[in-house]
Amino acid sequence: MEESKTKRKEDRIDLKNTPPQKKSKRDSTNDETARTSLRSIMPRGYKMMENMGYKEGETLGSNESALKEPIKVEINTKRRGIRAEKPDPSTMNDMQMSEQRFIKRESEMKNNKRLKKIWYRIQKVAFEMMGDSDLYNPGEDPRDFNVLWRSYVMQLNEEVAKNDLNNHSNNDNEDKNNMIPMVNESLEASPAIKGEKFGRPSTLIDCDTSIIGSRITKDTELAELEELSIEKRITKLNIFLRSEKYYCFFCGIKYKDEGDLYEHCPGVNEDDHK
């Protein structure tokens, strides 16, 4: 017991006699650099500045409101990085909002592409089930068909026109390749017809202007349909197929009659079939 008491007394005496802790080398160097003048920090640079007309205490340059000393370099003594502090909450909110808008826009674009594919497919089904595929002739006026799948007929006409152009260009290339090169002597004009100019014969193409005029005029019925959203157009055409052919596009089944349709089909919309 006595030995432990004596040890405690000795420890207390040592704590009293211990000198205060010294500052670290980094802190001492920072204090020294803060106290020292510009002349001692950069002697060569200071001499160059004196030669250029600088005097200690005066401004740098001719402007009176200019700096009197160069910008001091603040030494970062923290262990964190330069931008490792907590971000501003206002900027974080803006970043989150922009990210949410981007995700929403991407999902809307994907859904719109998916609905366009469904709209094309249901138009094709109606075009074939109603027998218009047997009556259709390439280049026919789309207004002769039902407005619910009229845009599908227009796409068919565009595809036929593109194929015709491609075939025509391929035939022209084949004709050019098969042409026999003429001898230069045969290209020389005879003395009797030298000096005469021959114009290229103009070709007249007969066309029915009534058909062109009918196609140029605006299709108001189709414009009214396209004002509706794609979901409403799909629903409208599906209702038409259900009433006319007892067929549900989302079921993919042609029912026997109206009773069989309403008994087994869950609904008109796509969401009803999920």
Curated annotation (Swiss-Prot):
PROSITE patterns according to UniProt: G_PATCH (PS50174)
Domain G-patch, first and last residues per copy: 41-87
Principal location class: cytoplasm
Keyword Oxidoreductase found: no
This protein's UniProt keywords: Cytoplasm, Nucleus
Domain of life, per lineage: Eukaryota
SMART domains from the UniProt entry: DUF4187 (SM01173), G_patch (SM00443)
Subcellular location: Cytoplasm; Nucleus
GO cellular component: cytoplasm; kinetochore; nucleus
Any one Pfam family match given in the protein's UniProt record, by short name: DUF4187
MF GO annotations: nucleic acid binding
Signal peptide: none
Residue ranges, annotated region (Disordered): 1-40
Biased composition (Basic and acidic residues): 1-15
InterPro entries per record: DUF4187, G_patch_dom, GPATCH11
Note: Present with 1470 molecules/cell in log phase SD medium.
Name assigned to this protein: Uncharacterized protein YLR271W
Source organism: Saccharomyces cerevisiae (strain ATCC 204508 / S288c)
